[in-house]
Amino acid sequence: MKKRHVWAMCSVMAAFAAHGGEVLFEHGKEFKIGNRQCKEFRFVSPDPAKGRVVVDLRCRIDYPRAAGWCPCWQIEVNGKAITAAATRSETRLLNRPYYLNNKWHGRYPADNRSDKWYALYLPDFKSAERHFNPPSISEATRVALDISDLVKTDSTNTVTLRAGGVSGSFYKSQGVTDRTPGVVFGEIRIYTEKELSRIPRATEKIVRATVKNSVKTVFSVDRKSDAFNVSVSGEGTPVKSVFSVPGGGEIGLGGKDRIETPFYTVSRKVAVRSNRIDIYDTFVSKTNELIGVKIRYEIPQKGFDPVYVAGDSSPSAEEFPGGRNPSVFGVNAKGGYSMALLAQDDVFRVQNVQYCKEGFFGIRTDGLALKPGEPRTVEWSIYPVASDDYYDFVNAVRRDWDVNFPIIGSFNLSMNMFRKFSEKSAKGIVRNFGLSVNSFGCHIWSHLGGKYKEYKDVIFGMGMNSPQVRVKIDAKKSVLEDPRVVHQFKRECIANARKYTPDLKILSYIHNQISVGIDDDKYEDCRMINAKGKPMNYNGGATQKLFVPTKDNLYGRDFKKLADWYLDNFDLDGLYHDELNHCNSRIYYGDKMWDGSTVELDGNNNVKRKLSYVCLLKLDFTLDLFGHVMNKRGKLFIGNFSPETRSERKFRFPRFEETYSSRWIALSHLYTPIQLGDMLTYANTPKDMAADQRMALKRGALYYHYCGGTGCPTLSSKMFPFTPVELHGGWLVGKERILTAVSGEFGWRGESPEVDVFVFDELGREVKGYPWSRKDTANGRIFTLELKPDHCAAIVKR
């Protein structure tokens, strides 16, 4: 172990010597950070204009053997989480390429294209060497980052390391009991080099709230035979439409209304609205065989920076699949305008990939199926915006999609705690979170205590009302258990909640793809199939099978009955549905079902095989389940994952986004903008939980607590109900209240309400008597609030 330390120290010090650097900070020993914990380092920096500043460290997941990798740590410089890419053209990662070649598992990435970094499961740093080709101990566990653009010269700098997402259940299932989940960091050093940084200096943009009028954009469309241009303020932007051709090659539509290939025709209809251009491209196959087409709608990236990919402006965000936020938004700062592309119809949304790469940003599908003679219309829109504000685009889409409806809350997943809660504890969590709705989370056996405390499994799907269920005890052993003991546990929790907190709405957890029933074999034709043609289990486990429910298959019909069973057998106000869109994989690779819309194409653009998106396969089932629970049974629904289809919008209920990756928060922007509390790296301390709530506001979202508790009412206690009017990066305007993590002027256009102002400090505590002012204007009453650092506030109508 000492030799490894000496080797690592010498190798890094050799780098200092080679580059003539100065050591600003060093911590020579290994240290471990557990899940939801952090460690902070401070240093003083010279002027980075004279030489770049580098933070250099090693990391690995503390595990007794090599076992793959996961995104599980975060690094912040002066409070800003950083990624491998500094800009669209400059990397921050100095010591290695973005991907390394792992001999067993393929490409090992640096980060998750957001602010979570990968680490390897390893017993020590040296053991990584044999798993990479070529051997790369110095690279696979090492991260050297250029932070020159973020350091300050007039005050102390901080580097914060956070860990989280190392699965404790994985440790238990593999019989690892000699250590706790966490990330081990090796020698961390911060130093300068003579070489100058290529990263442009960051300029801190001070966000200040204003009472904004809706942006009115004057634009025009110029359609020539070879081009489709959209002009804002006289400056034209070309929007390209490119389609693949079976046999190889591609064809562009330009500004024409119709093109024809030997295999299909495309006819275009354009509708110019007041704030957007709606485009309808109808494809008709001319062949007697199934064919497919790749479709790209894109804008040259030159002159546009930043570019938001599915709402994420990070330079690491190159592409993102799916229909939750099927948009790209590019800012042309020089021209004073922005351009956005948006997928609209169900199929194009689900198949959609948003991207910014290779000189273009756009939206695409890689395999739209065309049956013989079948017309298929792809609907998409262009949004010209006369500002550089992404949220002006978001608010325009939200109005067009009619998704500004009342959102209930606050919501939590802590019903399983109510069996042991005292009356004081039950009322405390309701008061502190502002809870109006609470749900059971996964039905975890260990929650029951007693002999079940060491069980490593969960009851999913049909297992809940099955005579027996499969339960995994450890890595090798499973037993059969009677689920009625879980039923009794749920009833005891519900009884206490009804007694202590009678106004609290109670939901039960459901998941429509995972099941552990003893007789699940009868659903074998409904199994989820992976890319190798094999049936899938949840997270690759042994007992939890994955299925695809449809309105017509046996599993789908029985799952609808299961929803009724929950509502009939427990005193519930509704259901919480986890992972509404898909689980583990978006794509079903089997041949027993087909979504009728998706194919995989080979290198010559010929059909290789049929594929299916799970969301499309089960769409009719999903809509039927929503209607049954909400309309026929009159119950509440809350869901995980924003809608991927237009069809789902007719059912209005809260759907949040998890935060395994912080970029997922932006996926909520076009429906109910809700972040489920950080699931990986933020600790359960008052300071971190308050910071997490402020971060949600800065990313344009409301907040549902996930883990932990608060010792006092925080901002979330004043957050709901909330009917969105406008979203902004730092403050949200609702009909009932305004929530803010920034200073500025606030109000409701044309209204002069009386309000109460609640301010919360860096620990989430209310600050009584915090100063604010108001003034009446011709456009309504304006409230001015100057917040101290790390404070937030709710301005609530009386």
Locate each region found by the language model.
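An acidic-aromatic substrate-binding cleft motif
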Residues: 379-472, 501-502
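Beta-strand-rich recognition/accessory modules
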Residues: 243-248, 259-260, 273, 278, ...
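Beta-strand-rich recognition domains
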Residues: 21-206
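Active-site-proximal substrate-binding groove within the catalytic cores of carbohydrate-active enzymes
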Residues: 373-374, 378, 613-798
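Asparagine-centered strand-capping/turn motif at beta-strand->loop junctions
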Residues: 45, 283-288, 748-751
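Active-site neighborhood of glycoside hydrolase catalytic domains
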Residues: 554-646
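Active-site-adjacent "subsite" loops/lids of carbohydrate-active enzymes
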Residues: 459-570
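Polysaccharide-binding surfaces and accessory modules of carbohydrate-active proteins
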Residues: 197-241, 249-262, 266-353
